[in-house]
Amino acid sequence: MSDNRLFTSVETLNLSSPVLEKLKLSGINTLEDFNTFTLEELRLLLQEAFLEVLPILKNFALPRNLQNLDLSEAVINILTELGMEDFQDLLQTKMAVLTKAFETNPLAFQKLNDLFKLYNHFPSISSDKEYGSRDYDYFKIRLAAPEEIRQWSYGEVTSYETINYRTYKPEISGLFCQKIFGPVVDFQCACSKKQVSIKSQFCNKCGVEFTETKVRRERMGHIELQTPIVHTWYLNSSPSRLAILLNIKTKQLEEIVYYVSYVVIDPGKTEFKPKEIITETQYSEALYEFGNAFVALTGAEAVKKLLENLNLEKTIKVLRKSLSENSKQKRESIIKRLEIIESFHQSDNKPEWMVMDVIPVLPPGLRPMVPLDGGRFATTEVNDLYRRILNRNNRLKKQMLQKAPRLIIKNEKRMLQEAVDALFDNAKTSKKNVNNVEKNRPLKSLSEMLRGKQGRFRQNLLGKRVDYSGRSVIIVGPDLEMHQCGVPREMAIILFKPFILKKLQETKGIDKKNANTIYEKMNEEVWNALEEVVKEHPVLLNRAPTLHRLGIQAFDPKLIDGKAIRLHPLVTPAFNADFDGDQMAIYVPLSLEAQAEARLLMLVSNNILDPKNGNPVVTPSQDMVLGNYYLTIEEKKDRTINSYDAAQRTAEHQYKHRNEGAFFADINEAKTAYQNKEIHLHTRIFIKPQAINLSFTEEQRQKYLMTTLGKLIFNDILPPSFPYINEPTQFNLDVKTPDAYFLAPGTNPKQFLKKLPTPKPFNKKFLSMIIACFFKQMKITETSKMLDHIKNLGFKYSTIAGITVSFADINTYSNKQELLQEVEARNIQIETWYNDGFLTDAERRRLVINEWKNIRDEIQEGLMKEFQQDNHIFMMSESGARGSVSNFTQLAGMRGLMNNPKGEIIEVPVKASFREGLKVSEFFISTHGARKGSTDTALKTAESGYLTRRLVDVTQDIVVIKEDCNSDRGFVVEAMISDGKEIVSLKQRIMGRFASCDICHPKTNALIIARNELITESKAQEIITAKIKKVPIRSILTCNCEYGICAKDYGVNLATNKLVEIGEAVGVIAAQSIGEPGTQLTMRTFHTGGVASASDITQGLPRIEELFEVRKPKGKALISELKGKIKKIDKIRSQNPEIVITEENDPDTEHRYILEPNVDILVSKNNSVYPGQKLTSGSVDLKELLRVAGTTEAQKYILEEVQKVYRAQNVYISDKHIEIIIHQMFKQILIIDEGDTQLLPGTEITINNFKKANLKMLEENKLLAVGRPIILGITRSSLRSDSLLSAASFQETTKILIDAAIKGKTDHLYGLKENVIIGGLIPAGTGILETTLFKYPKEPATTSELAEKTNQN
């Protein structure tokens, strides 16, 4: 800023008259005059006017001189060394430069921060950080030095008093003292003087600062301890960090700390050795004999002395040398010690800081004390713990002054140590005296305030309750459009209160107070204002549990009467909601940005596809399916009806379709005939294709189309580009209406209709296919409109159909008794064989069970054949609206075999069906399964929720951060086969991914797809047609990004069908995609009503957990460790058969594998085997597979096994989601040899850190470190996260904070969780962009512009 601008008169700055007067009186006429004063002088001269002048001082960087800013000499010296001449330079300096300069002097930096706070200035963050938090470079944690704790403090707490029980005012120097922590009432001191002036003035009488009461939430105090105290975290947590550091056994160290034993510091004339631990008796004897000629200490003092005497550098050298000389067992303990010593040496921590002379006192706002009725107080338990410390500390002080006996003082010191232990972590200190008297449980210590679901991290930082929210029961809103929801007026009037007040102020030109008065009257003006403000203002609806991102979506509110929220029936599958009493929460996005995001990204009509597999998630269900099924039924006139009242019903049917084969000019003529009861919805009629606005071939347009009125009505909702849908086939949907349905002029229509088979009606599956096809061709908005049409048709025609269920619909299977007699005869035969000794009990049981299974299947088949096409129950099942074949078999056939409580099949089946009624014994055996279903549901829902939580935690920092990482590696995929069946096709696996190399036609050599080109559906079809079986694709598993992943390796975002955008939080989406069906799998168990079935969920979820947690599998399979040939399989010794394999390169070398008895062998003699191939049935141990076959094979195995579990339950999840989880399981490496790096052999570090260490060695031409990949379970992977905040908020909070504090760990805030915890924007979506991208070059501002800006502030 040029100097001449400082000669601007203060009168041009539009300041208030009293302020201008004060400036004039102080001799300040121009901006330059401010430079003649220090900040403190300006504050005293201007008093309350200082706050009005402050923005001007900031804009013009005044006072200019650094000496005038009330900074200490130390601060000014550091700033001068950085080349800063004045205040303007300081304001333009980046935060990174300042933090680096003040790294060794945090107290001086605090002073600088106070200055920035006063000026409301935040130094800009360096933009060399490519990714992560916008506002902060990093978050660091370390041990606090005693001086720092005193520096944080605003005063020493010396009294254990809290609040005066008569006046309810805090006691002086007590735990709630106003002098230390700030006033209880805004700008009012302890002697009740009020002063609404500028901050930072103190009452002359009581010494309390006149300031806001909110400072009581941030100001800390301290307690000066009379004796040093060991921090319990470093002593009592396992493994004890102090014991490892000092190389003393934990038990012995505890004895020293709790004053049981002594440690020799200086042996003097005694026979003791330094660091030798001696008992009380030995100490007394030595003291008696040698007096002060030797030094032995006990308690924390002794530990502090030992730590101070520790020479870190020397110890490191000695330990590193002894590493190579010792046995494996000793090496492990040396590495543990070395790790801790290195941590202290490399960080700015000192080991003696683990022993405390002073402890901080939490601000009283965070540990309140509230008076209750009847003179009692409700208080936070931490207050009791502080009181106990103060009591004991004061007592110790008194005893020391009185020179009490050594034993008494020692006992008091031990009690003080225990009191401080209880404050920091009371869970580990299970002493009776630290219990809550009323509830007899340990008091809640500071550690408990952080730990677990109710702790600070998970309860208050990662999830908060929000204002402008409501909750109500949901009911169906069939009249709503796709993007709407019905909000009760009573709720909306409160939810939209701020917007209504603003509207009232605008329309009536009144102030806030008057607007509030009108609002409280709730008259017509207010309701009219509400109608205005809800227009175009989306709201968010959420149903718990929110299993995936579709569990919270945006809607346009439509005001309704009543008290229930109305929900569009098509969105229920996404929320997994039904209308049997479910409740939903509603939230109002307040800012314009939030409203824009809700409308563009979260609106229901924009979220039609499921992120886990790209299939439509808004499929019609129940009544809607049934209505459309009924609408598209096609019936022949000459059909004969067999069941009850056959003759009459056949006659009615023929009369209904008496005009079959009639010709109509257009749909309206057909509708008129229907209204006049000339034809039925299902009657087969002819119509000219020209009358229908859909796609036909030229040849078809010359003929007549055979269809029904129902199908004409259904096709009316399709766009002109679609073919006319006359049958539920893929050909009709994708290509054209089949020519078979067209009648050439001159053909006999009756003959034509006789030969023509009737196509099936449109069921749920086909409706989904139509929606998917529609979505590919049209925009999202068009799709949502079409879905609304399907819904309206469905409800209308299911009402017209009037489909009901009656007893008459359920007819028992006619051949049932004969079949039962046959199977019973066969079972008698099996029993005879067993009695004659031809069968073992297990074989007999297996045969009997198979007989009953087969007979149930036979009855099921026969029953389905006997069902009439117009049977209402059959229609419900066939359409996919409700119920399955199994349900009908139980209703009308036989219930079949049941499971007992252990999950084994009971041999005696339930022969009756529900229609016939069950015997008491049959009913009893049915109850086991039903109960198991209910308990399974409850248990597995929790289990699945926990799995989702772990998955989210392990992947939360995976975000798409760049377009391409230029990886040259690929992942070869092929169709997934399980038990001879294809479970995931090659097309499904490659669609929406990028090719990692050129793919050519095997015969013609023509290029099908180039490297790094997207494989679309048509390209994927070309690859399949070319009979290519294996395709190399770009994969997340081979991504080169240091943090997050790149768009090319991820491919298409399944929720939008477009290439994934930078900033998409793909990690969380992957975790939700795998976790959400996990809950569905568990919940589906009870739908079969406990009927014995092979695919019960119990295999599902535990298996997924076993894979993701890398546990040893139960039925472990044996795998080959080499490439070779099976020489022989020796089964002679039936106890333990063995397989002999010879090596491929050396046929004379044999490897023998001894098998468990009775295992299924999967290989035969002379078979070739490769490393990692299964030799016996069972599950492979992942760690073994990784060791034998390498990373790629292990990754491939996990991917396939997870897919098998989900496909068995008919859930399809895209590979890319599972790949993200696997990517996180392989992110660490085990150091085998450290080379010249500072790494320690035997430790596990992330691949990124390993690469960095080796790159450094390459540059310096030194020896590289060697490591091998390891596989981590998702829980361990989460806990090993680079982010200490993310790991600490997941599990084992104290353990992670202990290690992080010792190492002085830095969290670079790359993940989502850590940014949520510190209250910043998450580095995903719009938050991923660098601040530099939002900055535009500006013209230098003129003085008048700056003055204007100041006035606005």
From Swiss-Prot:
This is DNA-directed RNA polymerase subunit beta'. Keywords: DNA-directed RNA polymerase, Magnesium, Metal-binding, Nucleotidyltransferase, Transcription, Transferase, Zinc. The lineage of its organism: Bacteria, Bacillati, Mycoplasmatota, Mollicutes, Acholeplasmatales. The RNAP catalytic core consists of 2 alpha, 1 beta, 1 beta' and 1 omega subunit. When a sigma factor is associated with the core the holoenzyme is formed, which can initiate transcription. Binds 1 Mg(2+) ion per subunit. SUPFAM superfamilies: beta and beta-prime subunits of DNA dependent RNA-polymerase. Residues 118-1353 are annotated as: DNA-directed RNA polymerase subunit beta'. Signal peptide: none annotated. Residues 1-117 are annotated as: Unknown. InterPro entries: DNA-dir_RpoC_beta_prime, DNA-dir_RpoC_beta_prime_bact, RNA_pol_asu, RNA_pol_N, RNA_pol_Rpb1_1, RNA_pol_Rpb1_3, RNA_pol_Rpb1_3_sf, RNA_pol_Rpb1_4. Its EC number is 2.7.7.6. One of its GO terms (biological process) is DNA-templated transcription. It comes from Onion yellows phytoplasma (strain OY-M). Belongs to the RNA polymerase beta' chain family. GO terms for cellular component: DNA-directed RNA polymerase complex. Gene3D superfamilies: 1.10.132.30, 1.10.150.390, 1.10.1790.20, 1.10.40.90, 2.40.40.20, 2.40.50.100, RNA polymerase II, clamp domain, RNA polymerase Rpb1, domain 3. SMART domains: RPOLA_N. Transmembrane segments: none annotated. One of its GO terms (molecular function) is DNA-directed RNA polymerase activity. It is an enzyme of class 2 (transferase). Zn(2+) binds at C189, C191, C203, C206. It comes from the Bacteria. Its cofactor is Mg(2+); Zn(2+). Mg(2+) binds at D578, D580, D582. DNA-dependent RNA polymerase catalyzes the transcription of DNA into RNA using the four ribonucleoside triphosphates as substrates. PANTHER family: DNA-DIRECTED RNA POLYMERASE, DNA-DIRECTED RNA POLYMERASE SUBUNIT BETA.
